[in-house]
């Protein structure tokens, strides 16, 4: 049994650590494990199958103790969730450097990872779990909102009103889907095998209602579609069973996607025909049989998606590697539907835009509302962005420390960072602000089945870019920097980097913020310009980014 522990971040203006950066790292580590934030905090699991914040509780305690004693010119090294060393560096160096789940390519398989995991040698960090910047489902909801908004623009005249979106998976990431769809005016029918997860999304205002009856769910969805009413419905069921049944019934949704944890067949996907308890028993008793059955179920799931696509459903992969698993199981046409990045998001990446986020260390929601006003004032010409902030204020329930996310691009991030730092310096905000982002960003990830799928020059699998991103953020003075493997899509399919920087109101922080919040999105523009995207080339030239070989 997992050790029962409750972790929550300290808040307020008093710090226990020797500097605000160390204090911020401590609070954000604990925020990742807050019971309102983490999916399975007793097991240190934050989201995404087995994405963890620390390798085990002993490692967690050692990380906490070390952060409390860490000097302002020292750097703590984290190897797959374990604190392994402290070295004296300098005040502008990162206080923490993190490497999670990284395996030499020929060994980068789930089988080898699980062997090492059993020995206590490694940890799966997902993206923001092991890099201590997860903020609950809000962390993905604007990206999900933007994705569905682009679906609406491309296929439905700019709104999802009068449409049904069918999806599955209501975990930490997938839980954002119902709210994103209803924010775009549509009906969302979301299948989830675990009723507790559905209830959690209802409790946090991401989902409207739940049922265990397919007929009742369809009746509600069709009626709301007819009335052009926004509604989200959580259906208790297994997607590998429900989708084939819907195909038999002749039901075709308007939009179809999936956010189950198909990237990890052992820990993230329940095989068809099993209850949650039966699945847990089989997983422990015979993991190989479990994986085989889960993969067969994933294949059936994708075959049903393909059948619906042929009947007219706008279908896309939402970044969980479900197509690859199905293809490996013999579904030869699994890649007949596109991934969400090339279909809907890449133009934003070309401008250096991505899921920028910030957290109020004070714990006071008023600090976030004041920063919202900064966005509405300083970026008033960006109506999409302002619309998002206004909707977020009304619809987003904070999980753990108050936080906000919005997609800002090159130039915008640095401008925002300076304003926030000035507000901390003047006492307009009660405590420092943590600024970070998802690893899913314009220049920080190599993932051929997701963020870098179908690159114009064929450079999908080149992983130099996230490594350069991490190096650049470290020398620029980010507060903590991370390099992970396997986030989102599983072992062997991605390399990605994260950064977090603290606005503590000091002049030194102002300089670090200007450097990091310029170079971090700047590399995203460079990566896409180098691949030949005209929008990125134009952005690089307009912004004066120095690319020696740019024509």
Curated annotation (Swiss-Prot):
It is found in: Cytoplasm. GO terms for cellular component: cytoplasm. Its cofactor is NAD(+). Pfam families: Urocanase, Urocanase_C, Urocanase_N. The keyword NAD applies. It is an enzyme of class 4 (lyase). Its EC number is 4.2.1.49. The keyword Metal-binding does not apply. Its main location: cytoplasm. Pathway: Amino-acid degradation; L-histidine degradation into L-glutamate; N-formimidoyl-L-glutamate from L-histidine: step 2/3. SUPFAM superfamilies: Urocanase (SSF111326). Coiled coil: none annotated. It catalyses: 4-imidazolone-5-propanoate = trans-urocanate + H2O. Binds 1 NAD(+) per subunit. NAD(+) binds at residues 48-49, 126, 172-174, 192, 197, 238-239, 259-263, 269-270, 318, 488. One of its GO terms (biological process) is L-histidine catabolic process to glutamate and formate. Keywords: Cytoplasm, Histidine metabolism, Lyase, NAD. The active site is at residue 406. NCBIfam families: hutU, PRK05414.1. Belongs to the urocanase family. Catalyzes the conversion of urocanate to 4-imidazolone-5-propionate. This is Urocanate hydratase. It comes from Geobacillus kaustophilus (strain HTA426). The lineage of its organism: Bacteria, Bacillati, Bacillota, Bacilli, Bacillales. The gene is hutU.
């Amino acid at each position: 049994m997992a050790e029962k522990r409750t972790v929550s971040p300290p808040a307020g203006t008093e710090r226990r650590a020797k500097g605000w950066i160390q204090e911020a790292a401590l609070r954000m580590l604990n925020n990742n494990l807050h019971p309102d934030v983490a999916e399975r905090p007793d097991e240190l699991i934050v989201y995404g199958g087995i994405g963890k914040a620390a390798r085990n509780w002993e490692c967690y305690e050692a990380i906490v103790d070390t952060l409390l004693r860490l000097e302002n010119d020292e750097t703590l090294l984290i190897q797959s969730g374990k604190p392994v060393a402290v070295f004296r560096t300098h005040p502008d160096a990162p206080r923490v450097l993190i490497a999670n789940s990284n395996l030499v390519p020929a060994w980068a398989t789930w089988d080898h990872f699980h062997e090492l995991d059993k020995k206590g040698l490694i940890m799966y960090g997902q993206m923001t779990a092991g890099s201590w910047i997860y903020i609950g489902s809000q962390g993905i909801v604007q990206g999900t909102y933007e994705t569905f908004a682009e679906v609406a623009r491309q296929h439905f005249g700019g709104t999802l009103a009068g449409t049904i979106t069918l999806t599955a998976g209501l975990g930490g990431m997938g839980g954002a889907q119902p709210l994103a769809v209803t924010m775009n005016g549509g009906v969302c029918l979301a299948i989830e095998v675990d009723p507790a997860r559905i209830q959690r999304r209802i409790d946090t205002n991401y989902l409207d209602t739940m049922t265990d009856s397919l007929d009742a769910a369809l009746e509600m969805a069709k009626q709301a579609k007819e009335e052009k009413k926004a509604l989200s419905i959580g259906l208790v069921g297994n997607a590998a069973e429900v989708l084939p049944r819907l195909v038999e019934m002749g039901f075709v949704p308007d939009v179809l996607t999936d956010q189950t944890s198909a990237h990890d067949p052992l820990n993230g996907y329940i095989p068809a025909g099993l209850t949650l308890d039966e699945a847990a028993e089989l997983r422990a008793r015979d993991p190989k049989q479990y994986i085989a059955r889960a993969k067969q179920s994933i294949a059936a799931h994708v075959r049903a998606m393909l059948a619906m696509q042929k009947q007219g459903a706008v279908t896309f992969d939402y970044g969980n590697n479900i197509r690859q698993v199905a293809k490996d199981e013999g579904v030869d046409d699994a890649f007949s539907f596109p991934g969400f990045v090339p279909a809907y998001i890449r133009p934003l990446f070309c401008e250096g835009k991505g899921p920028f986020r910030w957290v109020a260390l004070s714990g006071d929601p008023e600090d976030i509302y004041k920063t919202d006003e900064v966005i509405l004032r300083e970026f008033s010409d960006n109506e999409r962005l302002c619309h998002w902030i206004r909707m977020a204020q009304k619809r987003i329930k904070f999980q753990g420390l108050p936080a906000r996310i919005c997609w800002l691009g090159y130039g915008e991030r640095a401008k925002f960072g300076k304003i926030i730092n000035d507000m901390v310096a003047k006492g307009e905000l009660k405590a420092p602000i943590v600024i970070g982002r998802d690893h899913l960003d314009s220049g920080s990830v190599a993932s051929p089945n997701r963020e870098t799928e179908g690159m114009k020059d064929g450079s999908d699998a080149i992983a130099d870019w996230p490594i350069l991103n991490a190096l650049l953020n470290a020398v620029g003075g980010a507060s903590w920097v991370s390099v992970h493997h396997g986030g989102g899509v599983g072992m062997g399919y991605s390399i990605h980097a994260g950064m977090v920087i603290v606005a503590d109101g000091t002049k030194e922080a102002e300089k670090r913020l200007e450097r990091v919040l310029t170079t971090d999105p700047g590399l995203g523009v460079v990566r896409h310009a180098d691949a030949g995207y005209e929008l990125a080339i134009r952005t690089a030239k307009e912004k004066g980014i120095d690319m020696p070989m740019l024509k």
